[in-house]
């Protein structure tokens, strides 16, 4: 009987979680439009301009991924090594062993050269079934990222201060007011903070 594929350690997912969050926050912030505009076009017929916009959106997303990839690839050789992955973790105050870094890379290293190429990186950032078991994985990684944004661990919420603090660690400098605005956009109950449900909504829109 085939054994179930072992799921990797939570440390190996911090890379995926934090970088996905950085990508989503920055990219969604740029592409966001007023809600009235989005509702007025909800039932509009599909047009050529819609197709062009979709193509441009895909290209922009790819360019954004390239920028994130370059942030990891410190020596510019087109590959992310375990050393470079560890260096990134250190820059955000997280220790990760060389073994754990290599494990994270091996999970999606298609050519088995021990490092992560750009296409492997794109695959990682767009995959939903991380373990190949037919299940859509996501909450585990999102919860890990959510916890990293909590100012008070276990509080169950992300405040503007917590968002600002973590974005600085990720190299995304934002004012307190900007962080308030980002939270307000996804704050369903209007209490000025994000709970996990609202955080998931932000990440999957």
From Swiss-Prot:
Swiss-Prot/TrEMBL keywords: Calcium, Metal-binding, Repeat
Residues annotated to bind Ca(2+) 1: 73, 75, 77, 79, 84
Keyword Kinase part of the UniProt annotation: no
Binding-site residues for Ca(2+) 2, renumbered to this chain: 109, 111, 113, 115, 120
Domain EF-hand: residue ranges: 60-95, 96-131, 137-173, 174-205
Superkingdom of origin organism: Eukaryota
Region annotation (Disordered) ranges: 26-55
Residues binding Ca(2+) 3: 187, 189, 191, 198
Biased composition (Low complexity): 35-54
Keyword Oxidoreductase applies: no
Function: Potential calcium sensor.
Name of the protein in question: Probable calcium-binding protein CML41
Encoding gene, per UniProt annotation: CML41
């Amino acid at each position: 009987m085939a054994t179930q594929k072992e799921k990797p350690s939570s440390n190996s997912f911090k890379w995926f979680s934090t970088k996905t969050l950085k990508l989503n926050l920055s990219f969604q912030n740029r592409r966001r439009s007023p809600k009235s505009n989005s509702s007025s076009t909800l039932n509009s017929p599909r047009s050529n301009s819609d197709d062009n916009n979709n193509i441009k959106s895909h290209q922009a997303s790819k360019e954004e991924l390239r920028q994130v990839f370059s942030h990891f690839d410190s020596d510019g050789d087109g590959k992310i090594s375990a050393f470079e992955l560890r260096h990134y973790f250190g820059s955000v105050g997280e220790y990760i062993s060389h073994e754990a870094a290599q494990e994270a890379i091996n999970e999606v290293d298609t050519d088995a050269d021990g490092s992560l190429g750009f296409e492997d990186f794109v695959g990682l950032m767009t995959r939903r079934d991380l373990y190949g078991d037919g299940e859509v994985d996501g909450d585990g990684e999102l919860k890990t990222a959510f916890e990293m944004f909590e100012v008070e661990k276990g509080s169950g919420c992300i405040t503007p201060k917590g968002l600002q603090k973590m974005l600085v660690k990720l190299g995304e400098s934002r004012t307190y007011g900007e962080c308030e605005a980002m939270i307000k956009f996804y704050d369903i109950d209007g209490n000025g903070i994000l709970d996990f449900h609202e955080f998931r909504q932000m990440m999957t829109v």
